[in-house]
Amino acid sequence: MTVGVLSLQGSFYEHLSILSRLNTDHIQVKTSEDLSRVTRLIIPGGESTAMLALTQKSGLFDLVRDRIMSGMPVYGTCAGMIMLSTFVEDFPNQKTLSCLDIAVRRNAFGRQINSFESEVSFLNSKITVPFIRAPKITQIGEGVDVLSRLESGDIVAVRQGNVMATAFHPELTGGAAVHEYFLHLGLE
């Protein structure tokens, strides 16, 4: 197994660091050749509009979507979740990978100054995770499993087959529970 981390923009170094700690083979994905070498992909948090532009400019956008639709496990955090979604409510014309049957609203928990940490349940354990200009999942389609919610009831982590996403940034906490779950995605 080789995990790729899309490394065009955003918090990719933090994901690479966690994968190193987990002794998992991993590479940065910046080109189509890089993408061809991976069996799993992480799309990091960052700025979704910039990430979209960079994936299109690099020629990776369609290749990433094709690999995901062919069954490659993928995990998106924050902006990565926006990129995986099928619809962005506040930017209805924003192009997405459309690989995860959810609708999202960008920056729904507030601006940068409104960033916060919260304890959430994830797979029967509690983890404290940061929400930084985080998107909110406003709708989920059939076949989408909820992995985590805030106390308010807001859905903050989901999975649909080989695709998972979180509104929060577990890569910034040093904890590895979410990444460990992703590494087993599709192996169960």
Swiss-Prot record:
GO terms for biological process: glutamine catabolic process; pyridoxal phosphate biosynthetic process; pyridoxine metabolic process. It holds the Pfam family SNO. L-glutamine binds at G46, E47, S48, R106, I132, R133. Pathway: Cofactor biosynthesis; pyridoxal 5'-phosphate biosynthesis. CDD domains: GATase1_PB (cd01749). The active site is at C78, H169, E171. One of its GO terms (molecular function) is pyridoxal 5'-phosphate synthase (glutamine hydrolysing) activity. It catalyses: aldehydo-D-ribose 5-phosphate + D-glyceraldehyde 3-phosphate + L-glutamine = pyridoxal 5'-phosphate + L-glutamate + phosphate + 3 H2O + H(+); L-glutamine + H2O = L-glutamate + NH4(+). Keywords: Glutamine amidotransferase, Hydrolase, Lyase, Pyridoxal phosphate. One of its GO terms (cellular component) is cytosol. Its EC number is 4.3.3.6, 3.5.1.2. HAMAP family: PdxT. In the presence of PdxS, forms a dodecamer of heterodimers. Only shows activity in the heterodimer. Catalyzes the hydrolysis of glutamine to glutamate and ammonia as part of the biosynthesis of pyridoxal 5'-phosphate. The resulting ammonia molecule is channeled to the active site of PdxS. Belongs to the glutaminase PdxT/SNO family. This is Pyridoxal 5'-phosphate synthase subunit PdxT. It comes from Tropheryma whipplei (strain TW08/27) (Whipple's bacillus). The lineage of its organism: Bacteria, Bacillati, Actinomycetota, Actinomycetes, Micrococcales. The gene is pdxT.
